[in-house]
């Protein structure tokens, strides 16, 4: 493709055109300054390379180990799965690693499947078995790791439930819908209704329950979501602290969640509350002429906690920057009829955020964390 970069001076705007023919970093310079672009093979192609790498290299195979079937961190320098997390919970087989299962299930629901179907289905079934039998207790309390249990962390529940609901939609197996609702009920029992989860599965959860014919449970879950949404509306800009005192991944999930509950109910209180949060969210976005800092959230601490060497910038940008894209995307959907111009701008920003976050995927399918 051809990139067009605008350099704005006091007197004029200079547009530099650069044809991107190779993958990797591309510098576009003008009068002592420059923009940093990234050439990739293609958005979908890069995602599919990542999916194939996960299938080929990141599912643990050891029946004697409780982590058998888990998607785990891959050491790109050691060229192997990282089996020793060195006591660092951010490197274990639970927690954020659930995102690999969600990614695969979400891909399975897409229109085109280029990744091997038999291998794909088997991997997901093995992973679902691992999650239910090793990462959860019978009552759906959810662990952070399969060996010692780790911290009972509220964030884990929404991710596991999202995975189950996507599996229900993908396979038509009602048990996955039951597992999804069971996991969310466990979340509410233990953490109440005021926890600011990342990725409350509003849309996927309601759709999965409806598809499974679980209409009563669907209405119950919607009421649970509304109860949480009411608390978020009441709190407004007084965001509670969680693992970090104040951060993008508290605000962005709240905006996304309120927008999805608005879409499910039509109650404008929820959309109004989301609108009031947007300036706080936008204040945490970079707008620099670099693919690492354009529509990317400021998350310097995660570049330390998640990096291999625990040096600030190890992970740059951090993948949770993409939560803002989900928030912008849902907000754009909500205002599409009332303000098409603003909706188009938020959708553009959402897509830019996702594109730039794709720099965490390499052309051979590996990733930075």
Which positions does each model-derived feature cover?
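Acidic, mature catalytic/reactive cores of soluble proteins
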Residues: 26-27, 112, 355, 362
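Extended polysaccharide-engagement surfaces of secreted carbohydrate-active enzymes
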Residues: 313, 324-369
């Amino acid at each position: 493709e051809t990139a067009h970069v605008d350099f704005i001076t006091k007197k004029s705007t200079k547009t530099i055109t650069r044809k991107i023919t190779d993958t990797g970093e591309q510098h576009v310079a003008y009068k002592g300054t420059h923009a940093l672009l990234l050439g990739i093979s293609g958005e979908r192609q890069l995602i599919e390379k990542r999916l194939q790498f996960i299938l080929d290299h990141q599912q643990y195979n050891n029946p004697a180990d409780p982590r058998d079937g888990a998607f785990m961190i891959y050491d790109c320098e050691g060229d192997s799965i990282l089996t020793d997390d060195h006591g660092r919970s951010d490197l274990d087989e639970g927690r954020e690693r659930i995102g690999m299962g969600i990614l695969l299930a979400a891909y399975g629901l897409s229109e085109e499947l280029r990744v091997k179907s038999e291998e794909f289905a088997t991997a997901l079934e093995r992973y679902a078995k691992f999650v239910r039998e090793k990462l959860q207790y019978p009552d759906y309390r959810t662990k952070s790791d399969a060996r010692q249990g780790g911290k009972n962390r509220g964030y884990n529940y929404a991710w596991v439930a999202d995975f189950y609901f996507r599996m229900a939609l993908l396979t038509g197996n009602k048990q996955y819908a039951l597992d999804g609702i069971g996991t969310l009920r466990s979340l509410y029992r233990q953490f109440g209704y005021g926890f600011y989860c990342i990725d409350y599965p509003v849309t996927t959860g309601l759709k999965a329950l409806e598809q499974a014919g679980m209409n009563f449970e669907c209405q119950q879950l919607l009421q649970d979501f509304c109860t949480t949404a009411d608390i978020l509306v009441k709190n407004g800009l007084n965001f509670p602290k969680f693992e970090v005192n104040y951060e993008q991944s508290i605000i962005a999930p709240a905006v996304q969640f309120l927008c999805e509950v608005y879409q499910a109910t039509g109650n404008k209180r929820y959309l109004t509350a989301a609108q009031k949060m947007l300036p706080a969210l936008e204040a945490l976005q970079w707008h620099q002429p670099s693919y690492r800092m354009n529509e990317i959230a400021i998350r310097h601490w995660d570049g330390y906690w998640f990096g291999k060497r625990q040096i600030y910038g190890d992970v740059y940008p951090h993948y949770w920057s993409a939560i803002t894209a989900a928030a912008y995307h849902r907000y754009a959907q909500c205002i599409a009829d009332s303000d098409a111009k603003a909706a188009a701008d938020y959708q553009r920003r959402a897509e830019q955020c996702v594109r730039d976050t794709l720099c965490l995927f390499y052309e051979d399918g590996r990733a930075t964390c």
